[in-house]
Structures are given as C-alpha cells and as structure tokens.
C-alpha cells in the first residue's frame, strides 16, 4: 500500500522519502534497545530534521511513539495516517484495530480509512474514507480481456501475512460468502482462506487471481 501511495505522490510531482519502521526495528535490536524502538524514534527524528517535510504520512506505524509524533507536530509539519485494516464492530480483530487507529488520531491532523467513518460505532477525529489504493505498476492483470475459467475470486486469511488457517477460528465473512455461493449455482467460485482451503499469498495469489473474471 505504501508503495502505491508513494508512486502516486511522485507522479504528482512530490519529493518522497520512505522509511520502513519494520526494517529499522528489525535491524537495530540490541541489549539496550531490545525491540529496536528507540532506534526507530531517533531515525525518524533525524530524517525529519534533514528532509524537512511538509507532510508526514503514517501507515500502520504502531511502533512510532506519541512523543515522536508530537515532536513533528511541534515543528510545523502536518501528519496524516492511512489505515487499511477493518474497524467495523463485526470485523476481525475489531478491538485491536480500533485501539490502533485511535492511538494516534488525537495527535495528528487527519486519518484515512477503508471503512466509511459514518458506519462505525466510534468516532475518529478528522477521518475520511479512502478506497484501497491501486497502481498500474502493481495491478498488471487485464482479466476482462480473457475468457476466464473461474467467475469469481475471493481470498482471505486469519491475519495479515498469516500463511495458514487458525485452528478453531471463524471469520464472519464466511457467512456472506457461503450465502453467495448457495444462491448462485451458475457461478464458478474460486475461494481461499475458508472451508479448509489455506490462504494464498504472493505469486500464488496473482496466478489464481488471473484465472478469474
């Protein structure tokens, strides 16, 4: 997602500096900084001082501290965040995702989420709906040009980048998908992440998606 957004910013003529909190924390763990979080704060602040951005865009930056965010705000930069995980009260990990999106919302200028803010049972300050970003350099398939062997593709998982189903886990999305299948015998479905069919990722995801209309 961040690469798609960055590509868009660059195409619009903006200068973009990208920082991966995961890479920094993973590469800077030590006895004095067990999770690499201190190194992350220092890296972000030092880059902020050197780059002097007009806008700082956060994406699921859970390890960025509120002190670091307040430092950025105090130095006259705008801050926004995007959040793609579901935050509806019937969605997976509702309580966890709600806490994550609210953690920084009072300290930043705006939040962009893939759920309609009006549909939520809680309020996110200065929040706006955004669709899942797409970019022609990533979305390379043109399925509409082909006669596909499958009609409808759907894939989910029991957690971001989780490679297998959780034992005993039930996802409410299964209810809708099963109803859809039951009511549409004439549609050839290709479903992953439920009915004991494991989730798919990376090239396997693209290969399977390419077979559907």
Predicted regions and their residues:
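Nucleotide-sugar donor-binding catalytic core of glycosyltransferases
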Residues: 1-31, 37-43, 51, 60-66, ...
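Acidic (Asp/Glu)-rich catalytic clusters
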Residues: 71-75
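A short, histidine- and acid-enriched strand-loop-helix "catalytic/donor-clamping" loop
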Residues: 81-94
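Proline-aspartate-enriched helix->loop->beta-strand connector
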Residues: 48, 52-56
């Amino acid at each position: 997602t961040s690469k798609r957004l960055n590509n868009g910013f660059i195409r619009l003529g903006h200068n973009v500096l990208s920082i991966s909190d995961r890479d920094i924390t993973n590469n800077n763990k030590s006895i004095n900084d067990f999770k690499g979080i201190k190194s992350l704060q220092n890296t972000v602040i030092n880059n902020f001082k050197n780059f002097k951005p007009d806008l700082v865009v956060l994406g699921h930056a859970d390890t960025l501290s509120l002190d670091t965010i307040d430092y950025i705000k105090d130095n006259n930069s705008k801050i926004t965040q995007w959040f793609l995980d579901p935050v509806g009260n019937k969605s997976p990990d509702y309580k966890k995702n709600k806490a994550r999106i609210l953690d920084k919302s009072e300290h930043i200028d705006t939040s962009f989420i893939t759920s309609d803010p009006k549909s939520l049972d809680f309020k996110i300050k200065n929040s706006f709906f955004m669709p899942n970003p797409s970019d022609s350099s990533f979305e390379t398939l043109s399925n509409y040009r082909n006669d596909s062997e499958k009609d409808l593709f759907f894939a989910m998982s029991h957690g971001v980048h989780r490679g297998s189903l959780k034992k005993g886990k039930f996802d409410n999305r299964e209810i809708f998908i099963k109803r859809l299948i039951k009511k549409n015998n004439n549609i050839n479905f290709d479903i992953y992440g439920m009915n004991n069919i494991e989730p798919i990722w990376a090239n396997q995801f693209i290969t399977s998606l390419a077979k559907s209309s």
